UniProtKB/Swiss-Prot annotation:
Residues 2-109 form the Thioredoxin domain. The lineage of its organism: Bacteria, Pseudomonadati, Chlorobiota, Chlorobiia, Chlorobiales. It holds the Pfam family Thioredoxin. The keyword Disulfide bond applies. The gene is trx2. This is Thioredoxin 2. GO terms for cellular component: cytosol. GO terms for biological process: cell redox homeostasis.
């Protein structure tokens, strides 16, 4: 099931991701990154699957360099799982949906 992910920015990251009471999966990506484009549909599917249970977000590193820099993002795509305002897990690369979901499930509930 496809859903709408949250578009995270330098401006809304604190309020919408860090201050949320839900677990968040944030995909750090760029338009010029081939593996990022491959991961896009997976993120949309996860947004539908986890609607109401977790925040599924994407953050464009070119448009939002402050947040990407703050988290030391060097390779993209990088996905961070954030819970209670802290990074609790990290994944790098265009991973399959089931691997991402398994990691996310470990931090929900």
């Amino acid at each position: 099931m496809s859903g709408k992910y949250f578009e995270a920015t330098d401006q809304n990251f604190q309020a919408e991701i860090l201050n949320s009471d839900k677990v968040a999966l944030v995909d750090f990506w760029a338009a010029w990154c081939g593996p990022c484009m491959m991961l896009g549909p997976v993120i949309e599917e996860l947004a539908g699957d986890y609607e109401g249970k977790a925040i599924i977000a994407k953050l464009n590193v070119d448009e939002n360099p402050n947040t990407a820099g703050q988290y030391g993002i060097r390779s993209i795509p990088t996905m961070l799982i954030i819970k209670g305002g802290k990074v609790v897990d990290q994944m790098v690369g265009a991973l399959p949906k089931n691997m991402i979901a398994k990691k996310l499930d470990e931090h929900i509930g």
